[in-house]
Amino acid sequence: MKESPVIKLRELLNLLPHRYPFLLVDKVLSYDLERRSIVAQKNVTINEPFFVGHFPEAPIMPGVLILESLAQAAGVLLGLVLENDRNKRLALFLGIHKAKFRQAVKPGDILTLSAEFSLISSKGGKASARACVGSQVAAEGELSFALVDKKSLD
């Protein structure tokens, strides 16, 4: 694994197509291309736009956005693996299997996002992913992605 923080926001913007308010990864703490694994971080603040309606009296991060943050962290690793191809191809989130939500994520929490790929091919990939607050698992599941040519989306 590399020293932390390996990838900060400016470089993340080159690896992910997402932008505010939908960019849900703040930095990459470590990654290992040989092991196909990554650890990233999302600082959850009260200023997140989703807290306006989810839920004003007791704000918690929507579970689907925790899963999206995991998918984005995994997407960063795919971007690093694709390196020369990433300007031509896009990783699309295909599905989530065995998703479990175990703990609420609240303003002020630091969400640690971990993913390890069991498969990366020219067509896509599969990864096991886990989001934690401290040592407590908040959500986990198996993610699948398709790699498509950006031109095919026009």
Swiss-Prot record:
Involved in unsaturated fatty acids biosynthesis. Catalyzes the dehydration of short chain beta-hydroxyacyl-ACPs and long chain saturated and unsaturated beta-hydroxyacyl-ACPs. It is found in: Cytoplasm. Signal peptide: none annotated. Belongs to the thioester dehydratase family. FabZ subfamily. The keyword Lipid metabolism applies. InterPro entries: FabA_FabZ, FabZ, HotDog_dom_sf. It comes from Chlamydia abortus (strain DSM 27085 / S26/3) (Chlamydophila abortus). PANTHER family: 3-HYDROXYACYL-[ACYL-CARRIER-PROTEIN] DEHYDRATASE. Keywords: Cytoplasm, Lipid A biosynthesis, Lipid biosynthesis, Lipid metabolism, Lyase. It catalyses: a (3R)-hydroxyacyl-[ACP] = a (2E)-enoyl-[ACP] + H2O. GO terms for molecular function: (3R)-hydroxyacyl-[acyl-carrier-protein] dehydratase activity. Its main location: cytoplasm. HAMAP family: FabZ. Its EC number is 4.2.1.59. The keyword Lyase applies. Pfam families: FabA. The active site is at H54. It is an enzyme of class 4 (lyase). This is 3-hydroxyacyl-[acyl-carrier-protein] dehydratase FabZ. It comes from the Bacteria. One of its GO terms (cellular component) is cytoplasm. GO terms for biological process: fatty acid biosynthetic process; lipid A biosynthetic process.
